[in-house]
Amino acid sequence: MQKQVKISGKSKENMSLLKHLKGDVQGKELVIEDSIVNERWKQVLKEKIDIEHDLFNYQKNREISKVPFLPVDRLITNDEVEDILNTLTEVLPTGKFTSGPYLEQFEKVLSTYLHKRYVIATSSGTDAIMIGLLALGLNPGDEVIMPANSFSATENAVLASGGVPIYVDINPQTFCIDPDKIEEAITPYTKFILPVHLYGKHSDMQHIRQIANRYKLKVIEDACQGIGLTDLGKYADITTLSFNPYKNFGVCGKAGAIATDNEELAKKCIQFSYHGFEVNVKNKKVINFGFNSKMDNLQAAIGLERMKYLSLNNFKRLFLADRYITQLAELQNKGYIELPELSEDHVWHLFPIKVRTEDRADIMTKLNEDFGVQTDVYYPILSHMQKTPLVQDKYAGLQLVHTEKAHSQVLHLPLYPSFTLEEQDRVMEGLFHVIKQEIGV
């Protein structure tokens, strides 16, 4: 019987698909899972496909003078724009911009994709984390163990909920929280573990779950950069997502979601997300307070259209990451840079490399000035190094050795679905030249 390569829109299967399309695996049949996230794939995928030509329209040696890091006018492809405009013509005449049928449909579709019983769509990923913590029973002063190298929204959600962030070190290879450091930080006040799937890399959730069970802690995962990860939500009490336009899957505004298999938790999340009201009862409060944090019906309608491209867009990210890793291997082998590992537990929200701390600023400047290539340090200030009164009072003297070293070395290269291979060639050409000729490592 011929073996199959299943296309599910998840990271593990995308890796198998990449190997199949590159010819690394022979004699397997492609099977496209019947899912909204694969809808665009069905239109472009064939048994034999030239990835560079069919997905990227690659024209080798086409001259490129400027490479933006993340251009806002290319967050949505032209095909998606057309689909979204068609949807808006259906929604706008109804006047149902906030509540409406698309919201419920969006939650059901996302629930099916995530293999979670309940999904509550929210107005942002930040609100999703905050509501999730409160639904799990966070009380003022409860400690939440988390990394310090995430976007400030993660810590802000904890602080706004009354929790106390406890920052621990990361695994420097993955940029994700180190489970061994979690155990060292547990105190009688610890109630939660909040791992972040930073840059799209899945944290070591199985290990984290084991620690949580041992100490009777709750796990709420920040998967705002991790939609499409295989086994997402498997080891967490609550999974939170962001649909900011800059994410792997976004709407045309701010939105997010909470996912769980626990009915009681889902009920509480719904209550907290809409003013504390009892579910399906008009304006009757059943908890002390709640927020105005439901996703808008209009954004849900847009989300349903954009979800059709999720599998394809995440595959493009994987292909681009693989291309970087393969073609920049020489620089890594000579010790000039450190590349991330290509793995089946990554959805490549960002592409981080490491360079020598003392060279980073020069590399970024020369790439931009000499090759027109924009790079970035996406989160320039670590949470425990902010200059706020709280940080200076509570975290003064805190040292996170691996977090701080990785942060001083990290440099993000452009990577997004509308990124062209010609642009990527320009990035790599510039990086080779600057590091080998200009920096003189």
UniProtKB/Swiss-Prot annotation:
Q: In which pathway does it act?
A: Antibiotic biosynthesis; kanosamine biosynthesis
Q: Which reaction does it catalyse?
A: 3-dehydro-D-glucose 6-phosphate + L-glutamate = D-kanosamine 6-phosphate + 2-oxoglutarate
InterPro entries, per the entry: DegT/StrS_aminotransferase, NtdA_N, PyrdxlP-dep_Trfase, PyrdxlP-dep_Trfase_major, PyrdxlP-dep_Trfase_small
Induction details: Induced by neotrehalosadiamine.
Q: Which residues bind substrate?
A: T98, S99, F151, N244, P245, Y246, Y274, K282, Y379
Q: How does it assemble?
A: Homodimer.
Question: What's the short name of a Pfam family annotated to this entry?
Answer: DegT_DnrJ_EryC1
Reported EC number(s) for this entry are 2.6.1.104
Instruction: Give the keywords, sorted.
Output: Aminotransferase, Antibiotic biosynthesis, Pyridoxal phosphate, Transferase
Q: Tell me the Gene Ontology biological-process terms attached to this UniProt entry.
A: antibiotic biosynthetic process; polysaccharide biosynthetic process
Q: What's the protein here called?
A: 3-oxo-glucose-6-phosphate:glutamate aminotransferase
Tell me the name of the encoding gene.
ntdA
N6-(pyridoxal phosphate)lysine occurs at which residues?
K247
Q: Which cofactor does it need?
A: pyridoxal 5'-phosphate
What this chain does, per the entry, is described as: Involved in the biosynthesis of kanosamine (3-amino-3-deoxy-D-glucose), which is known to have antibiotic and antifungal properties, and to be a precursor of the antibiotic neotrehalosadiamine (3,3'-diamino-3,3'-dideoxy-alpha,beta-trehalose (NTD)). Catalyzes the reversible pyridoxal phosphate-dependent transamination of 3-dehydro-alpha-D-glucose 6-phosphate to form alpha-D-kanosamine-6-phosphate. It can only use alpha-anomer and glutamate is the only amino donor.
Coiled-coil ranges (or none): none
